[in-house]
């Protein structure tokens, strides 16, 4: 059996829906408290972040909604809970900044991606302000116009 290729950037999973639903304002890097079977599953990229978000409670940050699918070979002696709440490791200054921003109306703390930093798993979290439906349409329209512009510039030299 051939080994799977590792991700070139070290990215395990991304939450693309978060970039679509929120204006990202500030990003933070957080460590995670994980069990052994979770790390083995992450090496096999068995992670889903679609509806994950960060809950700030009692001066601590907790990640909810992330789903790690357990490997059948790795978690034989442990009862694996794929959607358990996981503690995020942030310093006190970052926690205060997040708590103050989330108190404001319209702001949410969301998980953008998980990645490897040397041998550690890190979580990129962000403060985001929710987009309205017309904001999403504007973003899509802007992306389409940029694509057309780049296509026109690229094809301009080929018309000779």
Curated annotation (Swiss-Prot):
Superkingdom assignment: Bacteria
Compartment(s) where it occurs, according to its Swiss-Prot or TrEMBL record: Cytoplasm
Keywords (A to Z) from UniProt: Cytoplasm, RNA-binding
InterPro entries in UniProt: SmpB, SsrA-bd_prot, SsrA-bd_prot_CS
Gene Ontology cellular component terms for the protein in this record: cytosol
Entry's Gene Ontology molecular function annotations: RNA binding
GO biological process: trans-translation
PROSITE patterns: SSRP
Listed Pfam families: SmpB
Gene3D superfamilies: 2.40.280.10
Disordered: region residues: 134-160
HAMAP family given in the database record: SmpB (MF_00023)
Family: Belongs to the SmpB family.
Role noted for this protein: Required for rescue of stalled ribosomes mediated by trans-translation. Binds to transfer-messenger RNA (tmRNA), required for stable association of tmRNA with ribosomes. tmRNA and SmpB together mimic tRNA shape, replacing the anticodon stem-loop with SmpB. tmRNA is encoded by the ssrA gene; the 2 termini fold to resemble tRNA(Ala) and it encodes a 'tag peptide', a short internal open reading frame. During trans-translation Ala-aminoacylated tmRNA acts like a tRNA, entering the A-site of stalled ribosomes, displacing the stalled mRNA.
Record-given protein name: SsrA-binding protein
